[in-house]
Each structure stands twice: as C-alpha cells, then as structure tokens.
Amino acid sequence: MASPSFCLLAALLALVSWQAIASDPSPLQDFCVADKHSPVLVNGFACLDPKYVTADHFFKAAMLDTPRKTNKVGSNVTLINVMQIPGLNTLGISIARIDYAPLGENPPHTHPRATEILTVLEGTLYVGFVTSNPNNTLFSKVLNKGDVFVFPEGLIHFQFNPNPHQPAVAIAALSSQNPGAITIANAVFGSKPPISDKVLAKAFQVEKGTIDWLQAQFWENNHY
C-alpha cells in the first residue's frame, strides 16, 4: 500500500504538470524572434537565427497615431502582436490601442488565448464581462481617464463609450503574443458558411425570419 507521503508527492507532481501544460512555456533563451518564413510548423513561430536579429525586430513605429473610427460599431482596435513585432514570439504579451467614437463600442467578444488589462487614456467607458455557465454573472464598471479594468481569459467582454459628444481612447495589454479575438455577433450571424437558421432560431428562441434578417446584415470587423 502506498504511503501517505508518496500519495502527496504524486498529487503535487500531477498538479505541477497540469499547470505546466495549461500555460505557455517560459522562454529558454533571451529571445526567439519569429521567423515567419521558416517551413517548420510549431505552436507559435520558429526562431530566427540570432545573428540576423536587429533592433527593428522589437520595434513598431507610430502606434499612437489616431486611426480610423468609421465602421458601424464606432470603434477601431489596433493590435500590436507577434505579426507586427516578431520579437514578441514566446514572450506571452501584446498590446492594443482602442479608439471609440461618441457612442461607439467594442462589441461583445472574447480573447481565447489571453487575459486583458485595459487602461482608459481619454474619455469615459462603460465596460464589463460575463462569467461562464450556469450563472452568466455580469461584472461591469464605468471607467474614467486613468482607470484600469481586467477581463479574464476567454470570457465575453465589451466596452462602450456613453458620451454622445466626446471620443474615448484606451490601451489594452494582453497575456499572449497572439491573443485572438472572437466577436460574438460576427461569429454567430456572420460565419462562412452560415450556421443553419433552424439551429440559431432554436438557440435564440426567435422566428427563423429574424435569424435570416440578422444573417443578411454586414457584420463589420473592428479589429485591424
């Protein structure tokens, strides 16, 4: 019969192994600049030979230039991830600037691979996230300039500028070199090919004609 100490050791090893699998591994060298032309397929990118690495691999110019806000939802997300800065490969971090028109919003979405921490630079934002089933609890807050809010990894969240006259600006840091974004309405009603209207009518408990109308809309992407 196994001793209590052996059982405890086995449990601790199992816990440590699970935690190691559940998160990105730590870098094993100073940096691993993404080699986007490498034929090697890995989870992320293969490393560029260090002798070819320059400071430009860790640099992106003029991120804070004001981008467009002309889409229907009234916001623009400018993401700086490993695709823009190859030096972010294996470092587990990226950053985004979000510009909101008056009454603009960053609609409900998730980041499947990252936690987000948002800081308001200008204006006011109403923000929130919803927990998983079965409770679906909404945690929301009105943020002003300098305020910070956290959106846990994978949970549906949003930001809305309630001011009808003034724009707002925020910066978000995300805990992945490639956090991904799934905008809920776009994914459900704008998938290609479309989800069966019978499936969605049943799921949302509405008439099929309502689903057909929603699927006929142009679901604009505000992430660039």
From Swiss-Prot:
Entry coiled-coil feature ranges: none
SUPFAM superfamilies, alphabetized: RmlC-like cupins
Gene Ontology molecular function terms on file: manganese ion binding
Example of a GO cellular component annotation carried by this entry: apoplast
Disulfide bond positions: C32-C47
Pfam family, one: Cupin_1
Superkingdom to which the source organism belongs: Eukaryota
Entry binding sites for Mn(2+): H109, H111, E116, H157
Cupin type-1 domain residues: 62-212
Keywords associated with the record: Apoplast, Disulfide bond, Glycoprotein, Manganese, Metal-binding, Secreted, Signal
Major localisation: secreted
Compartments reported by the entry: Secreted, Extracellular space, Apoplast
Signal peptide (residue range): 1-22
Chain positions carrying an annotated carbohydrate: N76, N135
Residues passing through the membrane, by range: none
Record has Secreted as a keyword: yes
CDD domains: cupin_OxOx (cd02241)
Family membership noted in the UniProt record: Belongs to the germin family.
Subunit field text: Oligomer (believed to be a pentamer but probably hexamer).
Additional notes on this entry: Member of the 12 germin-like protein gene cluster located on chromosome 8 in the major-effect quantitative trait loci (QTL) for fungal blast resistance. Partial suppression of the 12 germin-like protein genes increases susceptibility to the fungal pathogens causing rice blast and sheath blight diseases.
Function text: Plays a role in broad-spectrum disease resistance. Probably has no oxalate oxidase activity even if the active site is conserved.
Protein name: Germin-like protein 8-8
Organism of derivation: Oryza sativa subsp. japonica (Rice)
